[in-house]
Structures are given as structure tokens and as C-alpha cells.
């Protein structure tokens, strides 16, 4: 197999043979040759119905002709300039038009950079140092947010190379647990600059907020002059034109964006209330910069993607997601398996646990060995999902009914085999 040969070569020059940890799975990942619509082709000549979709950016599917055409036209004019472009203005205006909290936008190169800037900005605006995140949430690969679950001084780095002092100001609480958050705010609220939350936890599988939970966060942050930041790197432009804040009708102070906003190219963005955003340099003194901020190729891909995402497309995505989740639940019921199917709109995951999944602690009870058997079983049948129990699956506008039917047939075969 060519993928096996490529993986051997890759392992000599790339740590672990990949450029990002989650792409690695045993015995080796397949290597991509190309993609079209909802199908991903491997160098081995295999074709897969793709529910990974590059971990979320490809809401239109692979190689949408309009996006490809727009990008090619931009590349002919240049790939980067180092001066502003009209495209940046147009994409920022499109974001502001769609996203409820967005009054100004700063482009970055990734979601990680966007959350870094958001935390710095919140600290500067409030004059406070501490931040709150949720157990199991992921906000990029920077030091302040790579922490193990813990309380106060028990918080510890989640990676070697991060000084303990760096994360002493990062507090963690369980998701969907109002009492834990209320206790934390009561004890440390005057020192907390921001609460950073994925409205749907998409990096521990796919966990929705319980009814009223996001509004609870909005209320308690307002009462305590704490900045509420929605990390919508995953949910932005996926659940609705305005993302999770439109979908759940709760408006934060700041929002971080990534993935879909770049239309398949590297891109991030920080947006929010004008009075906060005006503190970013050069308008203010909170420093944020980047050689490729507002890169014209990424901006072009993002702008064209947002143009294509209309109301009908979101209705179709919602319908497809509902159909697939209902189909999986029916399969589990027929097979007398008590696993959990979760997710809103075009997001989903199957947890191999019999208990309801409300937060990180619940998700960690899943049988990850069984999940990987499920993953490989689907892969053998031409269906590709992320190779981790703790990632989220995505549906694109390019998935059709026949793809969902084929996926459910494959899932039935695999789950039946696992039961037996």
C-alpha cells in the first residue's frame, strides 16, 4: 500500500509521521490524493464518505468549484501583499452582518491565534488576570489553555514545556454544571477576566449545552463584569449563519472564529463589541499582529464560502444531521445497545458509553478501544470519521441522502459485529 510506504517516509521527517497528533492512527493513516464533494480519495485508490471534513472547515465539501475558481483568480493577482485589501473589509462586513456580537473584526492565522488574542484582550480590558475554561475543552495549542482539569492551585499544565506558573491563573470547571461555576465565581469572581467556552464542546466528542446553560453563563458574567468569550472555531457558520450564538440565542462579548471562516485555508478571526475591540493595536495598546493576517487567498476562500451559505443550505444541513442521528439511534435500539448519539445541526458523535454525556467526566467513561474498532470497521466499508472518540463528526452540504443511507448500512454492519 502506498500509504504505508509514505508513512514510513513521513516518520523519518515528521514527529510521529504526521503534522498534527489526531491524524495519526494505527497501524498508519491513509494519505490523501484529493477530494471532491463529500468524498475523500486516498493514494491507495480508495474512496471514503468523509465525515471528518478536515475537522470542520469544509462545510461545502471538498473542492467546491466556486471557491476553487475564486481562489485561483486571486492567486493570479498575488498570494500576499503586506498591505490592506478590499477583501478584508468585505469579509469583515460579512461576519458583522451575520454574527450577533460582532461589531469589529481582527483577522488571525488560526483559531489558536484568535483565542490567544481574545484572552489577552479580555485581561487588558478588565485589568484582571484569571481566566475560566471548561474541563475537556480545547481552545488551541497555546500555554494558557492547555491545562488538565483541576481546581485553583490544582490546575496543572497538560503538556511538558509549559511552566506551572503559566497556568496558575487558568481555572477549570465542568461543563453544564451551574453550581460549580457559581461557586467559582463567588470565590474568585473579582479576579476573573473572562470565561472561555465552546458553546458546543467539539473537542471531547460533541456535547451540547443543556437548556438555559449558555444564558446562565451570560447572566453570571454580566453580574460580575466578566468578559464572556464564545470559542466558535468549530460552531461558527456551522450551526447557523450567526453560529452558536444565533442557534442558541445567547450573545457573548467576544467570539473567536476559525475553520469555516477561511473556506478551507488557514484563517482565524476575533470579533466582538466595539468598545472592547477598539483596544487592539493600532487603535489601542493591546498588541496583536501577524505577517499573514488577512491573507488575500484565505480571505477570498472565506468570503466565497459565506456567500454560498444561504438559509436553505442550513435547513438542509439540519435535516441531514437529524436523519443521521435518528438512524444511528434506531440502530442502537434495534441492537439493544445503550450507547449515546449526540450533536446539533450538522455535528454528531457516537459515544461508547451507556451513560448520558453532559461533560468531560461523562465522556471519559467511553470505551475508546471499542470506538477504534468501530472506526476501523467503518473505514473498511468506505466511511471516514475522525479517528478518536473525542473528536466531532461533521456533515457537509455535499452529503446526499444516498451517502447517509450508505453510512447507516455500514454502521449497522459494524455495530452488529461488535455486539456479536
Swiss-Prot record:
Instruction: Give the main location.
Output: cytoplasm
Looking up PANTHER family in the UniProt record yields:
GLUTAMATE-1-SEMIALDEHYDE 2,1-AMINOMUTASE, GLUTAMATE-1-SEMIALDEHYDE 2,1-AMINOMUTASE 1, CHLOROPLASTIC-RELATED
Pfam families, alphabetically?
Aminotran_3
Q: Which GO terms describe its molecular function?
A: glutamate-1-semialdehyde 2,1-aminomutase activity; pyridoxal phosphate binding; transaminase activity
* Alphabetically ordered keywords of this record: Cytoplasm, Isomerase, Porphyrin biosynthesis, Pyridoxal phosphate
Q: What Enzyme Commission number does this protein have?
A: 5.4.3.8
What processes does the entry annotate via GO biological process terms? protoporphyrinogen IX biosynthetic process
Species name? Methanothermobacter thermautotrophicus (strain ATCC 29096 / DSM 1053 / JCM 10044 / NBRC 100330 / Delta H)
Compartment(s) of residence:
Cytoplasm
Q: In which pathway does it act?
A: Porphyrin-containing compound metabolism; protoporphyrin-IX biosynthesis; 5-aminolevulinate from L-glutamyl-tRNA(Glu): step 2/2
What cellular component GO annotations does this protein have?
cytoplasm
State the similarity comment: Belongs to the class-III pyridoxal-phosphate-dependent aminotransferase family. HemL subfamily.
Decide whether keyword Coiled coil is in the record. Answer: no
Output the superkingdom of the source species.
Archaea
Q: Which InterPro entries match?
A: 4pyrrol_synth_GluAld_NH2Trfase, Aminotrans_3, Aminotrans_3_PPA_site, PyrdxlP-dep_Trfase, PyrdxlP-dep_Trfase_major, PyrdxlP-dep_Trfase_small
Q: Which residues carry this modification: N6-(pyridoxal phosphate)lysine?
A: 259
Keyword Isomerase tagged = yes
Record-given protein name: Glutamate-1-semialdehyde 2,1-aminomutase
Necessary cofactors: pyridoxal 5'-phosphate
Amino acid at each position: 500500500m502506498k500509504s504505508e510506504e509514505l508513512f514510513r517516509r513521513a516518520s523519518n521527517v515528521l514527529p510521529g509521521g504526521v503534522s498534527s497528533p489526531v491524524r495519526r492512527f494505527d497501524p498508519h493513516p491513509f494519505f490523501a490524493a484529493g477530494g471532491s464533494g463529500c468524498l475523500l480519495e486516498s493514494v491507495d485508490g480508495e474512496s471514503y464518505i468523509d465525515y471528518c471534513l478536515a475537522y470542520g472547515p469544509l462545510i461545502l465539501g471538498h473542492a467546491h468549484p466556486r471557491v476553487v475558481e475564486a481562489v485561483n483568480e486571486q492567486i493570479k493577482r498575488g498570494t500576499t501583499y503586506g498591505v490592506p485589501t478590499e477583501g478584508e473589509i468585505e469579509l469583515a462586513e460579512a461576519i458583522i452582518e451575520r454574527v450577533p456580537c460582532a461589531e469589529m473584526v481582527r483577522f488571525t492565522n488560526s483559531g489558536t491565534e484568535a483565542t490567544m488574542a481574545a484572552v489577552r484582550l479580555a485581561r487588558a480590558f478588565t485589568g484582571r488576570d484569571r481566566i475560566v475554561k471548561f474541563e475537556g475543552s480545547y481552545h488551541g495549542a497555546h500555554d494558557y489553555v492547555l491545562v488538565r482539569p483541576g481546581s485553583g492551585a490544582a490546575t496543572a499544565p497538560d503538556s511538558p514545556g509549559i511552566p506551572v506558573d503559566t497556568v496558575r491563573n487558568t481555572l477549570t470547571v465542568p461543563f453544564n454544571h451551574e453550581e460549580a461555576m457559581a461557586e467559582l465565581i463567588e470565590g474568585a469572581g473579582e479576579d476573573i477576566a473572562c470565561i472561555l467556552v465552546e458553546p458546543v464542546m467539539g473537542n471531547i466528542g460533541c456535547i451540547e449545552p443543556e437548556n438555559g446553560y449558555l444564558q446562565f453563563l451570560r447572566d453570571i458574567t454580566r453580574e460580575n463584569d466578566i468578559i464572556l468569550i464564545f470559542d466558535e472555531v468549530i460552531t461558527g457558520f456551522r450551526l447557523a449563519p450567526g453560529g452558536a450564538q444565533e442557534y442558541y440565542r445567547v450573545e457573548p462579548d467576544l467570539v473567536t472564529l476559525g475553520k469555516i471562516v477561511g473556506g478551507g485555508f488557514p484563517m482565524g478571526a476575533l470579533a466582538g463589541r466595539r468598545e472592547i475591540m477598539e483596544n487592539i493595536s493600532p487603535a489601542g495598546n493591546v498588541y496583536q499582529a501577524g505577517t499573514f493576517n488577512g491573507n488575500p487567498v484565505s480571505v477570498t476562500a472565506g468570503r466565497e464560502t459565506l456567500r454560498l451559505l444561504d438559509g436553505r443550505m442550513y435547513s438542509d444541513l439540519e435535516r441531514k444531521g437529524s436523519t443521521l442521528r435518528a438512524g444511528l439511534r434506531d440502530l442502537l435500539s434495534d441492537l439493544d445497545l445503550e450507547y449515546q448519539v449526540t450533536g446539533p445541526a450538522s455535528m454528531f458523535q457516537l459515544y461508547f458509553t451507556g451513560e448520558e454525556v453532559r461533560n468531560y467526566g461523562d465522556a471519559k467513561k467511553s470505551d475508546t478501544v471499542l470506538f477504534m474498532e468501530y472506526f476501523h470497521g467503518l473505514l473498511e466499508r468506505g466511511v471516514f470519521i475522525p479517528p478518536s472518540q473525542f473528536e466531532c463528526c461533521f456533515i457537509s452540504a455535499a452529503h446526499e441522502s444516498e451517502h447517509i443511507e450508505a453510512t447507516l448500512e455500514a454502521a449497522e454492519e459494524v455495530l452488529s459485529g461488535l455486539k456479536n
